[in-house]
A protein has these predicted regions:
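Short helix-capping/turn signature of helix-turn-helix
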Residues: 51, 112-118, 157, 161
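Short hydrophobic/aromatic patch on the recognition helix
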Residues: 41-51
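Amphipathic alpha-helical segments used for helix-helix packing
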Residues: 98-122
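Alpha-helical DNA-contacting segments of helix-turn-helix folds
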Residues: 51, 58-65, 72, 110
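Hydrophobic alpha-helical connector segments
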Residues: 60, 75-102
Length: 161
């Protein structure tokens, strides 16, 4: 990865981290794009290279944070060698709940902002190319299962809710 790509990644990461901090302390309504870029140390134009508005960064941030949760749970699942969809799903849910128990701000952010519309957009698309493709991994676990589900998206949303 070249210097330019690293710089872009650093700026986007700063925007994500700052937006998360501001959204969890001030709330979405009281946070402005100017607040985000000022605290992230980037120009306003940089924000608009990556996001349409603060609602767009919120939605992508949900996907990004959920991707981190699922990625860590997936790594732990791989190391555990647990088989069977139900057992694997229980393991992943327990792993995520353990993490959310220690990170109440993340739990609050996701629970406040997760709706069916945001869920469908956020969980079916990766926020970034290097984000963990958790929705696809979830579908892969389902494919390996003997049971067929009519609405795997709804099943996942229900579990998360």
């Amino acid at each position: 990865m070249g210097k330019l790509e690293l710089n872009k990644k650093r700026k986007k990461s700063a925007l994500y981290n700052t937006a998360f901090e501001l959204f969890t302390t001030k709330g979405l309504a009281k946070t402005t794009i100017s607040d985000i870029v000022e605290n992230a140390g980037v120009a306003k134009g940089t924000f608009y290279l990556y996001f349409k508005d603060k609602y767009d960064i919120r939605n992508k941030l949900i996907s990004h944070k959920a991707g981190e949760l699922f990625s860590e749970a997936h790594v732990a699942l791989e190391a555990s060698h647990i088989t069977g969809f139900t057992a694997q799903l229980h393991f992943i849910v327990d792993n995520i709940l353990d993490r959310l128990e220690t990170e109440s701000s993340l739990l609050g952010f996701i629970s406040k902002n997760l709706s069916w519309g945001v869920f469908k957009d956020a969980f079916q698309e990766q926020a970034d190319d290097d984000d963990f493709p958790f929705f696809q991994e979830y579908l892969n676990l389902l494919d390996q299962s003997d049971v067929q589900y009519d609405s795997p998206e709804l099943l996942l949303f229900t579990i998360i809710e």
